Amino acid sequence: MKQTVTSKRELEIVLLEQKRETTNQSKELLCPRQEESLIDLDSPQAQVVIGVRRSGKSTLCFQTLRNAGKTFAYVNFDDERLAGVGTAQLNDVLEVLYKVYGEFSHLFLDEIQDIEGWPLFVNRLLRQKMHVILTGSNAKLLSSDLATHLTGRSSEVSLYPFSFGEYCTMKAVDTHTMTTDKIAFRRAAFDDYALRGGFPELMHVKDGRRYVTDLVDNILRRDIEQRYHITYTAEFEALAHHLLNVSPTVVVTKDLAGTFSFKSAHTVANYIQYLKQAYLLVGVKKFSAKSKVRATQEKVYAVDVALMNQREDAYAGENLGWRLETLVLSHLIRKCKMEGWDVYYLSERYGECDFVVCCGNRVVQCIQVSYDISAYKTRKRELNGLMLAAKRTGCDDLLLLTDHHYEDMDDRGRTIKIRPVYEWTLEDE
């Protein structure tokens, strides 16, 4: 077992090893990410990249720095040898970094959220005109510290696992040529993506189930249980796996409290918030003019389909509709982050619509997702949900996403586009 560093010499050994690791990484085939354009390396603000573990945050920052030709130093605090580093030692870290790297204009601090006193340290660096890049895997810890100590001095970028377009780039799949063979290759790639998910390292590991199981366990124990001092860990983990198994699902905290023997619905609500802050789950609020409804009737999704199908004892592997809906949300949250839009779901007694996309108070698109609409009842139900959404919102941009169907149709005076999900996700690439 590696020991926590206690001297500058030991710190230098750790940082030299980390430097060698990043040098080796620079030789690997990397995928361009859309989020690279959102990182402003010339800004006086700290650039903060947050997202689920293993989504490629560090790689994105390395790519951005290297592509821009910046001189930078790097320290990864997600290293057990640096677990004891606190406020008093952060200046020692900076001193050793200058020794290891020489002069540098940018400082990349990876997974810094658990280091005591880091916001004050970063604030001092910014006052000294150092350009700082941060990554972290917990939205609350980063955001609360930033709000307290770095108000107006940080810019946040959210990163998610690979989109289907990025997956195709890494697999060298042609996403544009409209020939029979190229379309078939894209179709096959999407089937694989829908099963394996978008975590970058999953493309290179043989045992995907073991990888994802370990990833989820790591997030639950290190990013949540240890940080929030959760006592009943078995019950908490059972709740987390249940929500991943049944996602997408509308959260009813009172029912979950009874099922998992928690003392109150408030405890369940807190636990679900922790899961969202660690980016295991993504919440979608109900479309309503009433704030109370939006705040209480939330629908949760796994942040990536790998968390649904690739874990040991996963339940959702064969539920194709759930997987497709989750893939659509994964694409929507990326797109909406870029556009500054919000996503809701609509549910009433007379029907449902999976996604209502809003720009401020204006609804820009209503989207329904169904794996297969060949059955008359299924097709009618999905179209009725879209028509209900159109009536409630006044939106005329209506989209029905399926696994393979392509059609433009009129229904009750409105035009509905029916598209395969894999084609739709590539439109923005």
Predicted regions and their residues:
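Accessory nucleic acid-recognition modules appended to NTPase machines
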Residues: 2-3, 204-363
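Interdomain motor-coupling "hinge/lid" segment immediately C-terminal to the ATP-binding subdomain
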Residues: 2-22, 145-250, 276
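Pre-Walker A adenine-sensing motif
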Residues: 24-41
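Hydrophobic anchor at the beta1->P-loop junction of P-loop NTPases
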Residues: 49
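Walker A/P-loop
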Residues: 58
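Short glycine-rich substrate-engagement loop in P-loop NTPases that contacts/grips substrate
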Residues: 73-103
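Structural recognition of the conserved hydrophobic beta-strand(s) that form the central parallel beta-sheet
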Residues: 131-137, 158
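Domain-level recognition of nuclease-like catalytic cores that cleave nucleotide substrates
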Residues: 403-429
